[in-house]
């Protein structure tokens, strides 16, 4: 999914986490970042940090060449780029020799969906890079990316502003919202307190039966035997009044809700 670097973030640390994440297992973990999204005011600082830490930001011609190798003719991911080194991907796409120390290929992108191959999931050392005019546009773009390439999966945000984190967490269609951590490692529970797992559910929005990090309890059926511990009159709190059945049901429901809430408080 996308990774948003907010203006309140430590930019150098955020970029380090993203590149460390993307290069872990050569980008093959499905929770790894697929794109970086920033506001225009952050573009200079983020681009500088990316270059300083080993990002190869592609020229327009390099962008065009590599874009032809991301997807196959049927629209699915080209397996030739999956888990390959920067040098191998560069050779495959005809980009020439990578810059010294290049760890990840970064391609500027302006759209999402058909015709924008960098907006797709890329299980390799390739990141899309979106620059948006303001935070509202960033949020719309992140939602758009998730709905296109991974609804219900994972969203990363780098920020010290708690309000921004909460706002994005409520709005994005993701089962995992990872804050100030490498997404590939945070998503599987290595750098967060999420359940350790390599199978990540996407919930109903992603067509999955679970939004959990899938563990043993998600894969077994449990039979439960329940013994009665009280009678209906005890729940009502006394003898049943002489009223119609509909009214009895309504009062019973209210009493049950009241008792449940009382236990939770």
Language-model features: where?
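ALDH superfamily catalytic-core signature
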Residues: 1-113
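Conserved C-terminal structural/oligomerization subdomain of aldehyde/semialdehyde dehydrogenase
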Residues: 94-259, 263-265
